[in-house]
Amino acid sequence: MSVSRKIIYNVTASSISKVITTVIALVNIGLITRYLGQEMFGNYVVALAFFLLFTALGDFGIYQTTTREISRPGAKEDEIVNNAIGLRITISLAVIAISPIFIWLSSYSNELKIALGIVLFAFFFASFTQLLIGLFQKRLLMDRVALVEMFGKVLQLALVAIGVKMDLGFNFIVGTLLVTMFFNFIVIFWLAKKFVRFKPSFDIAYWKKFLYQSFPIGLSVFVSFIYFKADSIILSWLKPSADVGLYGAAYKMIENLSFFPGMIVGLTMPIISYNIFSNRKKFETIVNKN
């Protein structure tokens, strides 16, 4: 199959999966909003915002840089990926070690503080899943990732439905995110073992060169978080949870529908990286088509 056809296939498969996932997510949000009510849904929105904050803090551009580097001609894939994993472990553990201090010093309710602890561990699994996705992007196998994410959403919906039916409470609903992220990580890791022999590396000299390239990307990710999601956290400091819930319900609708541009860029980035130096004409063609 030609590269163009592979891209079209991946975009089509990912789009179909994402449409199904979006429908599931909207049903999920509907169940959660009705079950929790406006005030507790506000706490749920805050918990999700902190999940994205932890993700932004621990990003450092590692995923994007890894995907770019392994996609270049003659790349030492095992070395790049294993050093990226070692770096991700170090940064993620630092975020997990430091964040609880700020959580417990905050003025949030104890129930919400527990929820923030849950999403902190969800971030840990999500960050590694994101890193491994680069291996599939390089090989234009994002249909597999899309399928795993779709089943993850189905699992979360089933757990939320059980939680609502049995009245298991707010933190059980938040916990479904942790279970989903763990499920996604386990399956993606199992699939990725076919591509790389995983053995985390802690080469400080390599990390310095890597971070020199990745940190500006990580900074842009954090700025994007501030632009798109920091408003929910700031609102939770200024207004009651009920107001945050009202704002968050409307915002979730937009969030679930604005995925196509980022998906297309993600699918084509490995090919762009491969051709930027080796085949300039093809590189320009792909960029123009994007």
Tell me the role of every PLM-derived stretch.
Residues 29, 58-75, 137-138, 254, ...:
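Helix-loop junctions and terminal segments of transmembrane helices
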Residues 5-63, 96, 100, 152-153, ...:
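Signature of the first transmembrane helix
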Residues 4, 69-72, 125-148, 171:
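Membrane-interface junctions at transmembrane-helix termini in multi-pass inner-membrane proteins
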Residues 117, 148-194, 254:
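Hydrophobic alpha-helical transmembrane segments
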Residues 53, 57, 89, 93, ...:
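Alpha-helical transmembrane segments of multi-pass membrane proteins
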Residues 1-3, 7, 143, 171, ...:
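Interhelical loop/hinge segments that connect adjacent transmembrane helices in multipass membrane
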Residues 10-20, 78-79, 121, 136-161, ...:
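Alpha-helical transmembrane segments of multi-pass membrane transporters/permeases
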Residues 9-21, 47, 56-103, 114-115, ...:
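Membrane-water interface segments that mark the loop-to-transmembrane alpha-helix transition
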